[in-house]
């Protein structure tokens, strides 16, 4: 698949120890062997490239740092509201709200950056870093307003960058783009590279769509 992580085999590697180091469940080791058609698991030549589905990779939640902030911005986390300042960090599950003159820039675990515009409500659903690579698994929910993103190249890292809105889903690897949500109208502007946007019919949940 397009979002597979490419792992380069080192001396002494086997499907078993790769699984124990980097994957979510030990149950993946026979699947890893099958997926890559490994005939002799104990004698994989160093330098061999193995494909690992992104969904199998173990990851850790990472804080997101605010590198710039203007005007009034608050975060709601576990029912508690707090005014934000530059240099502070937020975590998965945080809901951001900017005022009419408010904006902020987020530095994400994989080095991607997101500029959250005025009059915007944005939930940071997922902010994780893959243990096997520098790739990030990022998911945001844009409830209203706009967010402009400069995303690091996620090809071969197992990384994903998803923005979910009431009107659709936008997914990307390695580009710069802006997403605006206004009354169930989704507008995606590509500033550099390519993105994929998927419209969601009223009353239905969106499926995650990856750029390929």
PLM feature spans:
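Internal amphipathic alpha-helical segments of the cytochrome P450 catalytic fold
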Residues: 15-16, 29, 41, 113
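Disulfide-stabilized cysteine-rich extracellular repeat microdomains
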Residues: 12-14, 37, 49, 121
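Primarily a LysM-type cell-wall glycan-binding module
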Residues: 2-23
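Extracellular LysM carbohydrate-binding repeats and other cell-envelope/extracellular binding modules
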Residues: 2, 21-61
